[in-house]
Amino acid sequence: SDYIDSSWSKPKVVNLGWKDERLNMGTINFSTDGRTMFFTGCYWPGSQGGCDLYFSKSAGSIWLEPTNIGNSINTSTWESQPIISSDSKKLFFASKRAGGKGGSDIWMSIKLKDNTWSPPVNLGDSINTSKDEMAPFLHADGNTLFFASKGHPGLGGYDLFVSRADALGRWSLAKNIGYPTNSLGNEINIFSSIDGKRSWISSDRAGGNGNYDIYEFDNYNEIM
């Protein structure tokens, strides 16, 4: 969907360029130049098992056959919701892999010189809890991380939180971004504009059209 004259156009199906008979794919994220697409594919042939992370390169108006991102990141459990940093050097994602704090955690991997990915690092106790953390979104500034959590104190269900990295890459204690962005329902997924002025979330709060809807709002101090 394109934003034209202060409104969104009717959604169009992405031209993937490959025959899509696979069971499930989603949580798409693009590199800054728009030429690499990262996404989740579940129970695909040749996968590590469960849901894995994949990437695809653009070729004009279509997308080339996807590539599994590899077993340095993917496991036999569940990896999902990739987000690439604006410089394409860091990949954040959610995973239920061994070695976490419990439930699904948020992890980070660094792109190496040979274009492979380093073994991922758990983002630690300031972000991950014994319950579920998921849906990471790294702002274009490279230091502001948003995510959904059931483990940190919240208003109900999943809430959205923000953490910021210092000069040494240490993440601050997660902060609930508050009402009215969070509600008594579930808020999962947030995207903020490059200029930091607007954000979009998905929520199943009361008053929507059913299940999860997308909401748009102007940012406030707790956001940026």
Residue ranges, per PLM feature:
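Short, conserved micro-motifs composed of acidic
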Residues: 1-224
